[in-house]
Amino acid sequence: MHFNRILNPSLRKCASQHIPTRVYGNMHNSNKLYVMKQSNYMAFLQEAKQFIPQERIYTDELRRLAWGTDAGFYRLIPQIVIRSEGEEEISRLLKLAGSHNLPVTFRAAGTSLSGQAISDSILIVAGKHWEGYSISPDHEEITLQPGIIGQRVNELLAPFGRKFAPDPASVKSAMVGGIVMNNASGMNCGTHANSDKVLLSARIVLADGTVLDTGDAVSRAAFEVTHRDFLRRICTLRDEVRADEKLSERIHYKYSIKNVTGLNLLPFIRFDDPFDIIAHLMVGSEGTLAFLSQVTMKTEYDYPCKASAMLYFKTIKDACRAVVAMKKLTDNNGGWIVKGAELLDWKSLASVSDPIFLKYRGEICSSPLPGIEPGDETGLTAVLTETKARTDEELKRNIGAIEHCLSHFRTYTPVRFTDKPEEYSQYWAIRSGIFPSVGGTRKPGTTCLIEDVAFHIEDLPEATAELQQLIARHGYEDACIYGHALEGNYHFILNQSFGSDAEVKRYEELMNDVKTLVVDKYDGSLKAEHGTGRNMAPFVRYEWGDSAYEVMKAVKKLFDPQGLLNPGVIFNDDPKCHIKNFKPLPLIPLDAKSPAAKVNRCIECGFCEVNCLSCGFTLSSRQRIVLQREIARLRQNGDAPERLALLEKQYLYPGNRTCAGDGLCSMSCPMGINTGDLTHIIRQEELPQGSLGYKAGNFAANHFAGIKSALRPILGLADLGHSILGTKAMSSITKGMHNALGIPLWTPAMPKPYKFKPKELKAGNKVVYFPSCINQTMGLPKKSPVEQPLVNKMIALLQKGGYEVIFPKNMEKLCCGTIWESKGMLDIANRKTAELEAALWEASEEGKYPVLCDQSPCLHRMRSTIQKMKLYEPAEFIYTFLRDKLSFTPIDRPIAVHITCSMRKMGLADTIIALAQLCSTKGIVP
C-alpha cells in the first residue's frame, strides 16, 4: 500500500508540507512493495516526529523521488526519507522500524552502482552531520564517521605524509560509510590495503538498536552481558567454517583477488576474537547487517616519489602477459615495485582519441605491421604503469627493474617512464577521460552501465581476450574494457537501452554469459569493487557454492532476524531481480545547441554533489536533473496532469530558487555538465518577454547607470541611520521593516556608497581595467579594517607596477550580464555582454592590451562569452605581470585564502595560493 494513500489529513500536515494524496501513473517500479497496514505507518511517523524534526522527514513526491536516486541503474522510490544527525536517532529509528516491521535502507553519498542504496520503504540518510574525525598522535590511525568524503580524509592526512588506504575512483565524492560498507577499492589498494585489511575497529548500531563499539572495552563488556547468545553464535560459525577444510580453502582462494560478491566471510578465517569478526563482517555488508556509525582504520604511507609510463602492446594478450610479469617484481623489502597497472583496450583508446592509437590506426591502414591483419586496429592495448618510492634513488631502481622485465616483451612504442607530474598527469588524464567519453557520447535515452569483474592473475591473458570477444558477440559495439589489470580487475562500460523487451533480454543473456565465463571457467569474481547490491544478488550462491552461501545466510539471520535491513540486497529470492526496476532516463527537451543540453548526458553518478552549494540545504544538482527528467516524462506522456502540476509546484523553491546557478557542479562532473545552465533555461521560461519580471529586467539593462546612481543615496541613507541610531537600534528597526515590508535585511557590514572617478596616468605598459558594477557602486562598511576600496587599491598597485590604467568608455552603463543570466533573461545578458565587449575592444586597441576585471564571477562570464581578448582576474594578473615588478615581504601571520567558485572553475586556485605564499609564511585554505 502506498504511504501517501493511507495517511489521515492531520498526519499529512505533521509529516510534510507537501503530501501527495494519490498514486499517479507508473511512478513506482518496485518489483516487491511491502504491504503494510495504515496503522504501522501512522504509528511510525507519530513516534519518529517526537525525536526527529519535521524538516528532516520527507514524505512529499518531490523529495522522495530526489533522494531515492543513486548512481546505479535501478530505481525504487522510498515512502519515507529521514535525514539522520546522530547515533541515538539511528538507534531509536531502528527499534521503531522493528516494532512496526518496516524495512530500512541506509545511504551516505549515493554513489553506489549496484542498487544497494535505494529503497521502496524507509531510507535513512547519513551524510551531512556525520563528518567527525580524529587522528592518532602518530598519524597512523584515523577514526571516521560515515559521512566524511574520502578525498577529505586524504586532505586531512596529507600534511603528515599519510593517506586513506582505500582508493575507489569515486573517492572525491564517496563517503567513508559507503566505501567501507561496499569494500570499495581502486587502482592502488588492491587486496592488501582495502577496508577489510586496514580496519581496526567499528562502532555499529544493530537492528535492535544496540550500540556496540568493538574498540571500546566498556562497550564490549556490556555487549557480552546483553548479547551473550549473539557472541556464542559468532564463535560457533567461526568454528564451523574452520572445521570445513574445503570451505576454508575456498574462502582463502576467493579473497586472494578482489571480491565483494556476497557477505565478507574472510573474518571467520582471519580472526579469533568475536568482536573483531563482527567489526570486519561490516566491511562489504552493504547495510544488510547493521548501521556503521564510526570506524577506526590504519592510514597508509603516501610515497613522495612517483613515475608513470604508458606502455603500448599490439595484442591484448601480450599486454596481460606483461602485467603478469610485472606483478612478480619486488623490492628488497618484499614490496611490490609496480604499484598500479591500468589496462586500456583499443576501444578505450579510441574513445579518447589517444594519439598513439591514432598513429597505429594510420600505420596499419597504409602499411600493415608484421603479424597484424591489414586495417585491424582491435589489438592495440595500453597499460598505464606506475611505480612509487621513498627516494629518487629508489625510484630509479624501480624503473630499471621494470624496464628490464619489459625487455622480454615487444611493445609498439619504446618504454619511457617520466617522473614529471606535468607529463604523467597527461597519461592519467587519458585514463580518467574514458568513462566520460564513452558515457557522454551514448545514444539518447540509454543507460551507462559499468560492470565489474576480477580474474586470478595467472588467468589474465586468456580471460581478458575472451571477455572482449564475449562483449562483442552480444553486439555491444561501443563497449570498452579498462581497469586495474595488476589486480585482475576489469570494468567494462555498456551503453544499454532498457526500452524494449529485446534489449532487456540482450542484457540478461550477456550477464548469463559473463557469469559462465567468470565463475565456471575461471572461478573469478562477478563483483570485485562495486558491491553485490541487486545486480548480482541472484548469483551469489552460484559464485560461492552452497556451503559458503549458507554461512552468509546464517550471518544475515543473526544480525537481522526480521529481515528488515536493506532487503533485496545481497540476498534476493527473485532470480530476475537484476533485470527489474530499471531507472528511466527520459530526455529533457532542450535545444541541442544550448549548453543546457549537456544535462541529457547525465548518468546520475552524484559526483557533482560535493561542489553543489545547495546540496544538503534543499536539492543537489543531480537531484535537479532527476526531477526535471521526471517532469519531462510526465509532460510527454500527459497521463498524470495532477502529479505533473504537483512536482512543478514543489520544484519551484528547492529546485529553482535555491540553485546558485554558478556551474561549480561541472568541475566534479565527469561529463562537465553545468546544471546551472538548466536552471537558467527554467528561469527563462518563467520570465517570457512581456512578463512583468522581464520588463523590469529590460528596464534595468537600459537604465543601468541611473540605477547604480540611485543606489548610492540609499546606501548613504542606511549609513547615516547606522551612525545616528547605532548598531543595536538599527538592527532592531530594520529587522522589523524586513519582516513587515520585505525590504532587504540590513547588517552592520552594509557598505557605504562609492563613486568611482577614473584617473589615467601615463606609463610604459598599459592595461584596461573594468571595475565590476559592485565595486563601482559600493564602498567599505563602517569600521572596516581596510582603509581603501578595492578599486583604489587595484589602481595604486597597477601604477606601482608601472602600468598605465585605461578605463572603457561609458563604464557606468556597462555590465558583463551575469545579473540577467542568473535570472534566466539570457537575451538581455548577451546584449549587455556585447556592449561590454565592444567597449573593451576599443579601450584595448583591438586586443593589444590585457583586460582586468576585479570580480571573478563577472570575469568567468566574460571569459565564456568574449573570446578575442586576454582577460585576467586580479590575483592572476598580479602573479603573472606584477610579481617581478614588485617587492614582496612575507608577514609571519596566517592568511586565510577563500577561493571563489568562479576562480576554481577558471583554474586559478593554485595561482591565488601561490600569491598568498608570497605575502605570508602561512597561507591557509580553510
What are these regions (language model features)?
Residues 48, 72-104, 122-168, 184-236, ...:
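N-terminal glycine-rich flavin-associated loop
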Residues 571-600, 609, 615-719, 828-835, ...:
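Ferredoxin-type iron-sulfur electron-transfer modules in oxidoreductases and energy-metabolism complexes
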Residues 31-99, 109-140, 169, 192, ...:
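N-terminal flexible segment immediately upstream of the FAD-binding catalytic core
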Residues 560, 590, 676-926:
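Iron-sulfur cluster-binding electron-transfer modules in prokaryotic oxidoreductases
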Residues 72-73, 113-114, 118, 151, ...:
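A gly/ser-rich beta-alpha-beta helix-loop segment of oxidoreductase catalytic cores
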Residues 54-60, 107, 165-167, 241-262, ...:
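Flexible, glycine/charged-enriched surface loops at secondary-structure junctions
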Residues 225-269, 550, 557-610, 616-633, ...:
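Flexible inter-domain linker/hinge segments
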